[in-house]
Design a protein with these regions (language model features):
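Non-ligating segments of multi-cofactor redox enzymes
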Residues: 1-393, 399-400, 405-682
């Protein structure tokens, strides 16, 4: 047998080999073939691409998919209202028949551009009464009949409406294209796909919330897959790992002054960090969002990439301002990348608690890297392994191996195989050469006990500190942020929100922004409504659709429109009409345009004569919030602050503010908001 020929492969139950076998250089000129050209190209890209091109291709596809989901599917959203069509305002009601619903309107300029047979929507101060047919025109009058019999509510609108009345060609406030439609159109796969397959996200959330989390199913599926491809998530799918690879390739390999040894106290950090995360979760505090792989990269790109995307593609004034919470998250994200200066993929090897979940799951693997007796101890596999998963005797550290198969592609004797774990045919001798790694001895046992103790104590301390400097939910005067529509009750919300920031990204107008330290560490990076910045669009329910843990329920649009986020409160001292400063109807117009009709006018500051009769021309129409209709969308606050505050400098803050709290919001774990509204109306 030629000593240069690879040994005959031994039989196995299955083989998972997909690496590109090592090819010896020949001293004789070789004809140029397509295969040799491909090998040359892969070699120029890098040794890991040449060794395991399948893995690198899968990594690239997953990373590009993550970026596509984040930067395209989640942005930009748009919705298109109906074209307003012709609007003729300034009409007065001349006659109205309650029985038939027929009415006559008159206008000083007459019925210009109107003719019998046309259909028009009758509108009072932005609120559409209904659609009417024009039955006749006489000089300055137009006669109308309703398309359908008027309801009691419509009759009341006609009887008590103060005008001015308008005739609209199209119904106001109608949207043929919704934000939610745009999301559904682009979501070939769910935008939160990578978040729901990070098992630490769902596992820690379920423990902290003491409830079932639907993404546990997805986490279970990926863990089952990784029984066959141990730590395959880390080696193939994780976009953070790929980004770290890119950082190490571009920067890390050029800066070697901070390099650390292969062995040290840090090699088991991921297990102790995982233990701390789970202990904190048992204490009712969710900290996995700080350190789990996918939330880290999602939030990092949100606070770094999304402002650049919005500023360049839209306008820089549309980028929300940053605060201390943003800085903390950005530093954490950059710190994860900077660990590569200590050692390539330091985070993935030694720190990542999501990877630790898969390492523990590796104990149940059915496949494994094996080394045959034909191994010549060349050390190439040890040098190229990205996860330090190969011992000095060239056998495998099974809890660290990701089956990336890079080692198989550099083995000159093709001694490495990826087969069932119980395959023991013709294997290399263990501990040859000596590894210096022994079974758990006294020192190892003490190290394990110490590290575990630190993990448990650290998790408990974090839980206690977070609760101590937290939301203070029992204090009625504590800060209560307005949460997204469909948010579960606040205690459960804080336990279920993973702080991934996905809901911020899909919010079309940046209504949802990251909370700072208003609720201490407990509320850090949780989504809150910033109504001074923008209001919640009535045609958008995207935040609930992308939430990976159910902290924000995925509501149908009809349910979302009646889910109360908070209640608009008018500051009577600041409101311009209430304070008798000047007339203003900004909030009323915005509320009616959104279709909520939750703010109406009352007459205030009307002067009376000696007989107690109101003096004509005195007083103002001032806004009053109808608590049974207000959902706390915040568009009234946005308009008031934008015009009266920023543009006219009449106010330091909005005179109408959305506030959350008991009796002002709907926070339910399950059930219908529509039925809740119906029950309240009875």
């Amino acid at each position: 047998m030629d000593p240069h020929e690879p040994p005959q492969r031994k039989r196995s139950l299955f083989r998972l080999d997909h690496f590109l076998p090592f090819q010896r250089a020949s001293s004789k000129p070789q004809a140029k073939t397509a295969a040799s050209s491909v090998r040359k190209l892969l070699r120029r890209i890098g040794p890991t691409m040449l060794s395991s091109p399948v893995r690198r291709v899968v990594q690239t596809i997953c990373f590009l998919s993550f970026l596509w989901l984040f930067f395209y599917v989640c942005w930009p959203y748009h919705a298109r209202p109906h074209a307003a069509g012709m609007i003729q305002a300034g009409w007065r009601v001349a006659e109205f028949d309650q029985n038939s619903g027929g009415l006559s309107l008159e206008h000083d300029n007459g019925a210009e551009n109107l003719r019998a047979g046309q259909k028009r929507f009758l509108v009072d101060q932005g609120a559409a009464v209904g659609r009417f047919n024009i039955t006749g025109i006489e000089d300055k009058r137009v006669h109308l009949m309703p398309d359908a019999p008027l309801s009691a509510k419509q009759i009341d609108q006609m009887l008590f409406g103060v005008g001015p009345w308008a005739l609209h060609e199209t119904e106001p406030g109608q949207w043929p294209s919704h934000y939610t439609d745009d999301l559904a159109r682009k979501e070939i796969v769910p935008a939160e796909t990578f978040l729901i397959i990070d098992p630490l996200v769902s596992l820690s959330t379920a423990i902290a919330a003491r409830s079932w989390v639907w993404s546990l199913v997805c986490a279970g599926v990926i863990l089952i897959v990784c029984v066959f491809i141990p730590r395959g998530f880390c080696g193939y799918l994780c976009p953070l790992g790929t980004l770290i690879d890119l950082f190490d390739w571009a920067i890390g390999k050029r800066v070697t002054r901070f390099r650390v040894a292969k062995d040290g106290w840090w090699v088991h950090i991921k297990y102790y960090l995982l233990l701390a995360v789970l202990v904190a979760a048992f204490g009712g505090v969710l900290i996995s969002g700080y350190v789990a792989a996918i939330p880290v990269i999602t939030r990092g790109l949100l606070f770094i990439g999304e402002p650049l995307q919005s500023g360049i593609a839209r306008e820089w004034h549309l980028v929300p301002p940053m605060h201390a919470g943003h800085v903390v998250s950005i530093l954490l994200f950059l710190g994860v990348l900077a660990l590569g200066l200590l050692k390539p993929r330091f985070w993935c090897k030694y720190v990542c608690p999501s990877g630790a979940v898969f390492s523990v799951a590796n104990l149940f693997r059915v496949s494994e890297r094996k080394v045959e007796s034909s191994c010549i101890n060349c050390n190439k596999c040890v040098a190229i392994c990205p996860f330090d998963a190969i011992k000095p005797d060239f056998t495998t550290r099974v809890t660290d191996c990701t089956l990336c198969q890079t080692c198989g592609g550099v083995c000159p004797t093709q001694s490495i195989k990826f087969v069932e774990r119980w395959n023991v045919m013709d294997l290399k001798a263990v501990n040859d050469p000596p590894t210096g790694e022994t079974a758990l001895g006294r020192r190892g046992f003490m190290s394990l006990i110490t590290g575990s103790g630190i993990g448990v104590a650290g998790g408990g301390a974090i839980a206690a500190t977070t609760k101590l400097w937290g939301a203070n939910l029992n204090d009625p005067h504590a800060f209560r942020p307005v949460r997204p529509p469909g948010s579960v009750p606040e205690p459960a919300f804080l336990d279920m929100c993973i702080r991934c920031g996905e809901c911020f990204k899909v919010c079309p107008n940046n209504v949802l922004q990251a909370e700072g330290f208003e609720q201490g560490l407990e509320g850090l990076w949780a989504p809150m409504v910033k109504a001074d910045w923008a209001g919640c669009e009535s045609s958008c329910n995207a935040c609930g659709q992308v939430c990976p843990t159910g902290a924000i329920r995925p509501l149908p649009l009809a349910e979302k429109r009646v889910a109360r986020m908070g209640l608009a409160i008018v500051d009577l001292q600041a409101c311009l009409p209430h304070a008798n400063r000047e007339a203003c109807q900004l909030c009323v117009d915005e509320c009616h345009a959104a279709g909520y009709h939750a703010i109406e006018f009352v007459q205030v500051h009307t002067e009376v004569d000696a007989a107690g009769q109101p003096i004509e021309g005195t007083g103002h129409l001032a806004p009053v919030v109808l608590t049974d209709k207000c959902v706390g969308c915040g568009i009234c606050q946005t308009r008031c602050f934008g015009i009266n505050g920023l543009e006219k400098n009449l106010l330091k803050q909005s005179a109408i503010i959305i506030k959350a709290g008991e009796g002002r919001e709907d926070r339910i774990m399950s059930g219908s908001y529509l039925k809740l509204r119906e029950a309240e109306a009875r």
